[in-house]
Amino acid sequence: MTKKRVVVTGLGALSPLGNDVDTSWNNAINGVSGIGPITRVDAEEYPAKVAAELKDFNVEDYMDKKEARKMDRFTQYAVVAAKMAVEDADLNITDEIAPRVGVWVGSGIGGLETLESQFEIFLTKGPRRVSPFFVPMMIPDMATGQISIALGAKGVNSCTVTACATGTNSIGDAFKVIQRGDADVMVTGGTEAPLTRMSFAGFSANKALSTNPDPKTASRPFDKNRDGFVMGEGAGIIVLEELEHALARGAKIYGEIVGYGSTGDAYHITAPAQDGEGGARAMQEAIKDAGIAPEEIDYINAHGTSTYYNDKYETMAIKTVFGEHAHKLAVSSTKSMTGHLLGAAGGIEAIFSILAIKEGVIPPTINIQTPDEECDLDYVPDEARRQELNYVLSNSLGFGGHNATLIFKKYQS
């Protein structure tokens, strides 16, 4: 069976770099950091002092207050970004096409803020005072459910939860839905709102977060002095569309998605497999799925979390897959500016990968001040680079040994 071609026709984002795609992208290519002092929780209680928060976001600017109160923050972000993406795609979801329009949006954690607040009510006021909206606000699939309701999309409706690989897995899974003919359009990506007391406590306890108090330099992927990731929030949603469907309605096309790889480490609950073996296989699977040679990849948007082992092993994985070509590749981590959006990271980074192809600009890795001999690739330090790109690869790796890779291509008719 001939695989259907799948293109990207819409983008929507809420990120620490901006409350829309254009602002987020322009800040990324200008090396602007979206990281600042923690305001959502009392920083005095935690070793980590900085976070990548949304700025000046008021959900009532985007939806009715009554509806917003029925959603956890992660769902609010997803619905807002999805509406942006569909509007950008100029897609009118009529009753006729609704059964062929699906939603596949994931969250690595779900409604942790709701869980914390309702558990406090449970403890202090008793079980009868817990909100009837507690469960439907908390569960991770509710972002997809609320997007489906908001858009009137009645096709495939699913949710992936693979920790920090969630956004990338979601897009890859949605890509395959269209490729095999089960939908014409998929609204897909990732969302996360993890800036809560328990989340900071948990990630601090396992030593994952940077304790650098300087917001400008705390997230420093591939730098010798990196000491952990900076937690962030937001949503990145894209519209995937079967090519003929997009052409028939005259849609603008940002680029094409051509490859997806997904593997498991079977190694450790939080640490990546030694030498990046699982990540290497995910990249190899995606390259095979795309039907291209490794040497055709021009740029890698790395997972690049600013943790010691991730950056070391991802570098090793890239060398395993690409051999000599690894040193000719441009590799950058936009997490140096956005922080780590966990389940939303893959969605935002897919958008940056797509725009890198469309605009011919590679966003930089900022804060590489002290080179690490174990991280010796071209990480596009400090300044964006103009370069024609035909194929871009994006990696996401998650707790539990989840590895996911997407490959995007410059669209050619």
From Swiss-Prot:
Coiled coil: none annotated. Belongs to the thiolase-like superfamily. Beta-ketoacyl-ACP synthases family. It comes from the Bacteria. One of its GO terms (cellular component) is cytosol. Residues 3-410 form the Ketosynthase family 3 (KS3) domain. One of its GO terms (biological process) is fatty acid biosynthetic process. Involved in the type II fatty acid elongation cycle. Catalyzes the elongation of a wide range of acyl-ACP by the addition of two carbons from malonyl-ACP to an acyl acceptor. Can efficiently catalyze the conversion of palmitoleoyl-ACP (cis-hexadec-9-enoyl-ACP) to cis-vaccenoyl-ACP (cis-octadec-11-enoyl-ACP), an essential step in the thermal regulation of fatty acid composition. It comes from Bacillus subtilis (strain 168). GO terms for molecular function: 3-oxoacyl-[acyl-carrier-protein] synthase activity. The active site is at residues 164, 303, 340. Gene3D superfamilies: 3.40.47.10. SMART domains: PKS_KS. Pfam families: ketoacyl-synt, Ketoacyl-synt_C. Keywords: Acyltransferase, Fatty acid biosynthesis, Fatty acid metabolism, Lipid biosynthesis, Lipid metabolism, Transferase. This is 3-oxoacyl-[acyl-carrier-protein] synthase 2. It catalyses: a fatty acyl-[ACP] + malonyl-[ACP] + H(+) = a 3-oxoacyl-[ACP] + holo-[ACP] + CO2; (9Z)-hexadecenoyl-[ACP] + malonyl-[ACP] + H(+) = 3-oxo-(11Z)-octadecenoyl-[ACP] + holo-[ACP] + CO2. Inhibited by cerulenin. It is an enzyme of class 2 (transferase).
